[in-house]
UniProtKB/Swiss-Prot annotation:
Pfam families: Complex1_30kDa. GO terms for cellular component: plasma membrane. NDH-1 is composed of 14 different subunits. Subunits NuoB, C, D, E, F, and G constitute the peripheral sector of the complex. Its EC number is 7.1.1.-. It is an enzyme of class 7 (translocase). Gene3D superfamilies: NADH:ubiquinone oxidoreductase, 30kDa subunit. The keyword NAD applies. This is NADH-quinone oxidoreductase subunit C. One of its GO terms (molecular function) is quinone binding. It comes from Burkholderia multivorans (strain ATCC 17616 / 249).
Amino acid sequence: MASKIETLKANLEAALGARVVSLTEAIGELTLVVKASDYLDVATTLRDDPKLRFEQLIDLCGVDYQTYGDGAYDGPRFAAVTHLLSVTNNWRLRLRVFAPDDDLPIVPSLVDIWNSANWYEREAFDLYGIVFEGHPDLRRILTDYGFIGHPFRKDFPVSGYVEMRYDPEEKRVVYQPVTIEPREITPRVIREDRYGGLKH
């Protein structure tokens, strides 16, 4: 008798065929990778196929692979990773799609398939700059509307570009260039034989 994950894998391969770029198992969960051009079609099949029935999108996030594997990674930079749940069959699936263009990452929106994707896609847009084509209201959700850049990208500076402060003369919040100076932090080594001024 096949295990639940083997049954799911067989059902996915039968339903999706050549649209599967890769299907891997790790830590008891399957990860399905598809092309951006097949993303909506695959998502609809995952939801509607009677042998799959992924009724719920439970999470969606962006990923920046710029420094993945200590810089040895040589694939597309940005991906949207979706976690799906089938309540009917009691199984989960991770669905990954890579944006074909690193300079302007665009993937289709899943809002018309699972409306729970709405705010998740807005968050991935806000933090990574991934554009979800067809999203009904793609605007920032966590950062300020005037925020410059996307703070979860690997090339975004830790200190940011600007800082905000309240200006009592103007009686409003103003932006100004970051005043934090870059510094190198060197850890202080405390030797056991001189710890706390005690000599052993």
